[in-house]
Curated annotation (Swiss-Prot):
Belongs to the influenza viruses nucleoprotein family. One of its GO terms (cellular component) is host cell nucleus. Residues 1-22 are annotated as: Disordered. Its main location: virion. One of its GO terms (biological process) is viral penetration into host nucleus. Encapsidates the negative strand viral RNA, protecting it from nucleases. The encapsidated genomic RNA is termed the ribonucleoprotein (RNP) and serves as template for transcription and replication. GO terms for molecular function: RNA binding. This is Nucleoprotein. It comes from Thogoto virus (isolate SiAr 126) (Tho). It is found in: Virion. Coiled coil: none annotated. Keywords: Capsid protein, Helical capsid protein, Ribonucleoprotein, RNA-binding, Viral nucleoprotein, Viral penetration into host nucleus, Virion, Virus entry into host cell. The keyword Aminoacyl-tRNA synthetase does not apply.
Length: 454
């Protein structure tokens, strides 16, 4: 099912502020309870992460009123004695979950608090496939360097959820939606007729507003004005500038389906502090959650994918992660092609440890070189301060690797980029020692400037 179709809903109407944060424990509990109820009804073990992912996806589909979801359907689960599990097709009746979602989620009284949470939950859970399959859908469609895909996070979630958390979605996603809007004006899904100009203008202004709130450079905002008018000559220059003049992306710490299903206590749950680290450590200490993959060689990397998914660290410096979590972090290129889901099997236990922690970065933190395919710039997820690295001296080389070029804004943005590149530190606050708020400085001796997709 496609999840990146054009959003034609227009800018959402202004509503009274809904305090989602205080409802996090309750929403986590409700998702977990629905997962456990559905699994127990069909005798599906939730101590296997593959099974949790399937069950969790079904609950998510019910919560978002997915049109492709059938009341009764067949799904594949790992079933059988420990150590001898086999993929088994099971018929699942989800009518009770559909009824629950209708009253608890879809009701207008609750929808406003649920959708921002569901958006973050979907971003977190879709990260695993993004890492394993390593595709570049947004940058390829925009015809810019694949190195910039780190600023297309969240592209795979439903548009109605993107609207609930627009600042948690990468700016290139908004840029792609704007380009599609101009090239293929949307139609009303009911009448099949093109939308009236006021509706299209409303959608365009909403997208442009999201972009301008995320991008902090004055020249970047000037280029966005050009895009709004349908002039895309400066696209590659704008995209390259994101690596130096880094945008605001609101990061949150969100548990994945296997962690939710295996968490016993959500008291005090938040999306932004040490509770998330502690919750993962408790699940790890139980030694009951089993991880799936191609074979045992993948176990450490599959456990690291949990970290990348929960903390949204796919663009973070691996040196920072090694210091925070106390162990070597792997690059995706160290492993071969991932197996088909039908060939996945239990390969080990979920393990998690940490030595330091930091809150998620929700503001702008503060590199560019040739036509490299891998990641060449850190997109910080943690607020803690750390050294800032530039793997480039100008934006010339990266811009030449993209499909479209311009000189209109080039000199302006180059000068502005240099000011940011000269900064030696990025991040806005400090790291903390495990178990409290004792401030700790990131060590300058740590091995940094390596990336998951490098």
């Amino acid at each position: 099912m496609a999840t990146d179709q054009m959003d034609i809903s227009g800018p959402p109407p202004k509503k009274q502020h809904v305090d989602t944060e205080s409802q996090i424990p309750k929403m986590y509990e409700m998702i977990r309870d629905q997962m456990r109820t559905l699994a127990s009804t069909h005798k599906i073990p939730l101590n296997i992460d593959h099974n949790c992912e399937v069950i969790g996806s079904i609950i998510m589909a019910a919560c978002t009123n997915n049109r492709d979801l059938r009341p009764v359907d067949k799904y594949w689960f790992l079933m059988g004695p420990a150590g001898a599990e086999v993929m088994t097709e099971v018929e699942i009746d989800i009518q009770p979950q559909l009824q629950w979602a209708k009253g608890a989620v879809h009701d207008p009284k609750y929808k406003g608090q649920w959708y921002p949470f569901l958006a973050l939950l979907q971003i977190s859970n879709k990260t695993k496939d993004t890492i394993l399959w390593q595709k570049y859908p947004v940058t390829q469609e925009l015809e810019i360097s694949n190195s910039l895909e780190i600023y297309a996070n969240g592209h795979g979630i439903k548009d109605r959820l993107k609207n609930s958390r627009p600042r948690s979605v990468g700016p290139l996603v908004h840029l792609l939606h704007l380009k599609r809007l101009q090239e293929n004006p949307p139609k009303n899904p009911k009448t099949k007729k093109p939308l009236e100009s006021p509706a299209v203008n409303g959608i365009r202004k909403s997208i442009v507003g999201h972009l301008k709130r995320q991008c902090i450079g004055e020249t970047q905002k000037a280029m966005i004005n050009q895009f709004e008018m349908g002039r895309w000559e400066s696209l590659s220059t704008f995209a390259a500038s994101l690596l130096a003049i880094k945008p605001r992306i609101e990061n949150h710490f969100v548990l994945t389906y296997p962690l939710i299903a295996n968490c016993e206590d959500f008291a005090g749950a938040t999306l932004s502090d040490e509770w998330v680290f502690k919750a993962m450590e408790k699940i790890s200490n139980k030694k009951t959650l089993r991880v799936c993959g191609p074979d045992e060689k993948w176990i450490s990397f599959m456990n690291q994918i949990y970290i990348h998914s929960v903390f949204q660290t796919t663009g973070e410096d691996l040196g920072v992660l090694e210091w925070v979590f106390g162990g070597r972090f792997c690059q995706r290129k160290e492993f071969g092609r991932y197996c088909k889901k039908s060939q996945t099997k239990v390969i080990g236990l979920f393990t998690f440890q940490y030595e330091y922690w930091s809150k998620p970065l929700k503001s702008a933190p503060r590199s560019i070189e040739g036509s490299k395919r891998g990641q060449i710039s850190c997109r910080p997820s943690f607020k803690g301060k750390r050294p800032s690295y530039n793997n480039f001296t100008s934006i010339d080389a990266l811009q030449s690797a993209s499909g479209s070029q311009t000189v209109s804004f080039y000199d302006q943005v180059r000068e502005e980029c240099q000011k940011y590149m000269d900064l030696k530190v990025e991040g806005t606050t400090c790291f903390y020692r495990k178990g409290g708020h004792v401030e700790v400085e990131f060590p300058g001796s740590a091995h940094c400037n390596t990336y998951l997709f490098g």
